[in-house]
Structure formats: structure tokens, C-alpha cells
Amino acid sequence: MAATVSTIGAVNRTTLNNSNYGGLVPNSAFLGSRLKVSSRFTTSKMVTGNFKIVAEQDEEKQTEKDKWRGLAFDTSDDQQDITRGKGLADPLFQAPMGTGTHNAVLSSYEYISAGLRDYSYDNNVDGFYIAPAFMDKLTVHIVKNFLTLPNIKVPLILGVWGGKGQGKSFQCELVFAKMGINPIMMSAGELESGNAGEPAKLIRQRYREAADIIKKGKMCCLFINDLDAGAGRLGGTTQYTVNNQMVNATLMNIADNPTNVQLPGMYNKEENPRVPIIVTGNDFSTLYAPLIRDGRMDKFYWAPTREDRIGICTGIFRTDGVPFEDIVKLVDTFPGQSIDFFGALRARVYDDEVRKWAVGVGVERIGRNLVNSKESPPTFDQPKMTIEKLLEYGNMLVMEQENVKRVKLVTSI
């Protein structure tokens, strides 16, 4: 049997299954400043058995006195601790949890992106319309950033701005699909965080991820939706935070040094590929003025013409069998409406079918049939869309818009 010495610094050993090999385990103990070792080998045979050494574990002796023990979990107001605020803010305003951006002890390269967008549709087959001017601007900007032009400084950022609901983001996605580009996506909600500096770090991470895709031989770009909503200043009711400043400063720095984008705390001399940045917004005058200067950002104002509106609406109603003449009449009847208006108009036509189904099932049994049913969800026959019905629902939408502008319940008190 292996002897056990219960002294300070002792190692406790478990008993071997075969007691014949007990002499093979040496005995040692610290006695003051001297070390006594007694070892006696009774046989010279090779031993193939397994034995286990078990030490008594006392976590309090180590963790309570360790000054670094709370590095990844401290909720103090220390700028080094980037985990402050984790789980306390709405996830819309933070990067995805568990991806490395909230844990101070992880390497930045352990970040796994949730922003890579994969488009599975082909706009040529599905019949979507791309405005020629829009496609020309995006194509030229992207190609210029992948070329090496002599003595030419090409703006890295393309800012597409215009009225609300005019299809800026969707037109960009169609151009990306046409060119075979899977962009790295960001939105305005990711440009603010409870942790100072995290959105700026996220921009650099997404940019370097797009650069890695380009390095592997596939075109890519960084696509930021509604930049002015996240980094702009919209009147006196909007608070300008440190993150707003750092987002603007980071984009300016990347635009000036597009091939030398480093992550915080990780610096090397290896250059990364240049990545075009496409941003959308409604009003770029709310952004920091040096960011939108011509050397850094190329601006493109998107205001669809009548031909563009007809072409886009043809794509919206492509599966409904609406004649081209009716689409032209519909566009001309509502000339001041956005592109999104016609998508909402098409959705309104299904209201009658949904109402019939709800009445037939019974209001009290709707939940049982929609979310707690073994049967498949209900399907509807495609309603016939006539120009009369479209004009009727279109006028209803216009009346609702005018009613909101006219009543103004908050300001009328």
C-alpha cells in the first residue's frame, strides 16, 4: 500500500488496484526545510498499470487573494473592462453575445461574424428591376476601389442618401447579387453600445473580416445601413456620445488608411486588402462634416425617376398578373409616394382574404390554429388585383397619411 503523509505540502495518493506494485511509488514529505525521500524498488519488471494522483482542492486559498480574478466579470466603471453592461442593454444596441466582443479575456480574432449576408436569389430570373443610374454608380465605385489607378486617390466610402422608403438598401442588395458579392452587413443599431469604444472596434472587425474574404479571392464589401441614424445628430433631442465620436473617427481613419486597419491591441505590418464601404442614409448633413468630404466619401443622391418607379413597381407586382398599363396608371396616380408605398399597397390587398379566414376559424381559436397546431399554417389563394381595387386601397393609405399629419395629437394639447 502506498503510504500517505499528512503534513504541510504533502501529496495524497490513491491506493493502486494491484497492491504488489505499492513499492514503486516513492514517499516524500517536506519536514521543515529538509526533504526526506525514501524509495525502494522491489522488482525490475515493466508495469503497465495506471494510477492517479489526487490533490486536495481549496479554491478560496487561490481565488480570493488573486487580484486578477474578476477581470472578465467585474462591473466597475473601469475602461479596461469591456464587459461592463453585458446583458443590461437591449441586444439591438450590442453586438451578438458570445462572439468575443463582450469578453475582455478573448482575442479579437475569435470574433465570429453574424453580419455576412448570403443572397440566394438571382435578380435576372426573379425579374427585379435595378435602376441603371444606381447600378452604374455602385459598380463604378466598387471597381475603382479594387483597381490600382496611377496617382488617383479614390474615395473608400460611397454614401447613398435620399428620401425614406425609396428602396436604397434593396437596390444595393440587387447590385451586390448581380455582381456576386456577399457583403458584410452592419446596421445603425450596432453603432451604439453600453461599452465605450465597442462600436468602433466592431467596425474594424467587420472591415478586417471583409478583407479576409477578399484575400481568399472573393469580392466583398462593408455595407452599413442607416448610418445617419446611428452616428448622426438629429436635433437637440439626440445625445451625442463618445461612441458617436469614435464611430466617425474610425470611419475617417479607415478611409485615410484603408490597407492598414488594425484591431485594438493587435498590431502588425502586414497590409490588408482594400474593402469598399457602402453606407445608406436619409440626411448626411447630420454626420460629422470631415467624414463626408469628397476625398473620403463619394455621395450619391437617389431619387427614382418615373421610369425607375414604373420598373420597380413592375417587379413588385410581377407575380400578380397586373397589366403594364395598370402599373403605369397606378404610378401616375400616386406620384408623390415612395416605392415602399406600393409594397404596402400590395400587402393591403390580402386583408380581405385574411379577414375571411379569421371569421371562418373564430377569433377565440386563432392562436390554436396559428402557433399551436399540428397542421400546417393556412394558405391563401392569390387574390385578383384589379386596378380599381389597387386605387381604392391606395386612396385609403393616402387618407391615413393625411390624417396623421392633420391631427397631431401631441402638439394640439
Curated annotation (Swiss-Prot):
Binding residues annotated for ATP, in chain numbering: G162, G163, K164, G165, Q166, G167, K168, S169
InterPro entries on file: ATPase_AAA_core, P-loop_NTPase, RCA-like, RuBisCO_activase_AAA_helical
Keywords noted in UniProt: ATP-binding, Chloroplast, Nucleotide-binding, Plastid, Transit peptide
Record GO cellular component, one term: chloroplast stroma
Location relative to the cell: Plastid, Chloroplast stroma
Classification via Pfam families: AAA, RuBisCO_activase_AAA_helical
GO molecular function: ATP binding; ATP hydrolysis activity
Function description: Activation of RuBisCO (ribulose-1,5-bisphosphate carboxylase/oxygenase; EC 4.1.1.39) involves the ATP-dependent carboxylation of the epsilon-amino group of lysine leading to a carbamate structure.
Protein name, as recorded: Ribulose bisphosphate carboxylase/oxygenase activase, chloroplastic
Organism, as annotated: Cucumis sativus (Cucumber)
Organism lineage string: Eukaryota, Viridiplantae, Streptophyta, Embryophyta, Tracheophyta
